[in-house]
């Protein structure tokens, strides 16, 4: 498992050489996976609290990491997609990340951006969380906020170094879903994405953003996005 920046380095996507460089911020990739074959996880139930959502993610993530090398990058990606979509408020995060441009998008474009955003997140996590070397993932508490609930946690790396990771949770129906991630209580994942997306939208428009997200996911997983 490698904990480091997850910023969109779209200059590595060969098919999009014109995308402007954006400032990279450190963030932590946090994800979870469903089992394939012999692996099994409990049937998903309505979460009682935001902490339950994060604990479920962490339990599944550890199981995926322990089988990471056997699954390979495409197998890890396939496992991560369903849990990412049931644990993260992908559409909400995509909307905030796109910013003011969201209001001018058609419903079809909004759906495409949300799907590509979720696919990119899953691919990045599958790439970063690829093995297990004794790491610990722990929920340490939760507290109410004006916009929902903040769940605090830490990832203890193999060398014993703790990394503080907090989750902003948003109520969606009966479930609490992750709407943002903060590294060291300061670096917002959504704010980082919004800064990066703004540069891409300015030069390449919404189609360029969708292509960049899919291109990055393709590069990380070797699985080409389906045509809409």
Task: Report the location of each language-model feature.
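Surface-exposed, charged secondary-structure patches
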Residues: 122-163, 213-228
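Low-complexity, intrinsically disordered terminal/linker segments enriched in charged
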Residues: 182-228
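Bacterial N-terminal signal peptides
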Residues: 29-38
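Surface-exposed, polar/charged faces of alpha-helical domains
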Residues: 48, 63, 67-71, 75, ...
């Amino acid at each position: 498992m490698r904990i480091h920046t997850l910023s969109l380095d779209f200059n590595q996507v060969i098919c999009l050489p014109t995308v402007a460089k954006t400032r990279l911020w450190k963030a932590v990739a946090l994800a979870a996976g469903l089992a394939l074959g012999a692996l099994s996880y409990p049937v998903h139930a309505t979460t009682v609290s935001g902490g339950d959502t994060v604990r479920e993610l962490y339990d599944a993530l550890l199981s995926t990491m322990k089988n990471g090398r056997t699954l390979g990058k495409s197998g890890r990606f396939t496992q991560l997609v369903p849990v990412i979509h049931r644990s993260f408020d992908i559409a909400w995060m995509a909307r905030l990340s796109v910013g003011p441009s969201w209001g001018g998008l058609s419903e079809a474009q909004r759906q495409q951006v949300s799907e590509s955003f979720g696919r990119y997140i899953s691919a990045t996590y599958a790439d970063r969380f690829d093995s297990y070397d004794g790491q610990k993932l722990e929920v340490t508490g939760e507290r109410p906020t004006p916009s929902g609930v903040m769940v605090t946690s830490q990832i203890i790396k193999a060398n014993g170094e703790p990394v503080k990771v907090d989750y902003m949770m948003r109520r969606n129906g009966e479930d609490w879903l992750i709407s943002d991630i903060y590294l060291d209580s300061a670096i917002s994942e959504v704010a980082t994405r919004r800064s990066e997306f703004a540069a891409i939208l300015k030069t390449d428009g919404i189609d360029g953003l969708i292509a960049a997200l899919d291109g990055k996911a393709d590069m990380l997983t070797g699985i080409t996005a389906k045509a809409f």
